[in-house]
């Protein structure tokens, strides 16, 4: 569950995908970097984000058309702070993703990225990584190191990408009538604002349609063409 900040006391909603700040939090836990609770007043960012914000990632949803099913889960919050009175009980509805799975790529182009590759390849972790909250443990499997190559030309991006960095090739869509086309789009966090540490959002897209005017470098990794951000 990757909780959206725009919630009330009774409903907690999730983003539809893991996002870059959440990924950096996982990597920070693996490497043992401090989080929000350890920040001092002089710090602009928590230690994990300060050290890892320049890491480049690529995210591929392992879901039909990019969409994971969501379900509402109910639980009791019996703290006095939550229910506004000692001994009170507040029933909270929380939205979860069902069986989420992603292929995550990290561009190894600096020392912190090299540390991430070393720790994850050797299955080392200082703290337990989790998906959004600590009762959803992150299961990191099938770790490989791959040689990637930058493509001089590409017609598709097979991962989430920033919407403003490419355009749907509308001319090609009419010739793909035998293919089930899809387009997933959502405003997702890509960073933190230095003034408040709140999420910096941008529109992200995942599609099997052909693209034009691709502004990012497209990497071939295995059998996929992906971009990093």
Regions found by a protein language model. Give the residues of each.
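Internal, well-folded beta-alpha domain core
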Residues: 62-229
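Short N-terminal binding/cap micro-motifs at the start of the first secondary-structure element
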Residues: 1-5
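Glycine/small-residue-rich interface belts in oligomeric ring/scaffold proteins
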Residues: 6-74
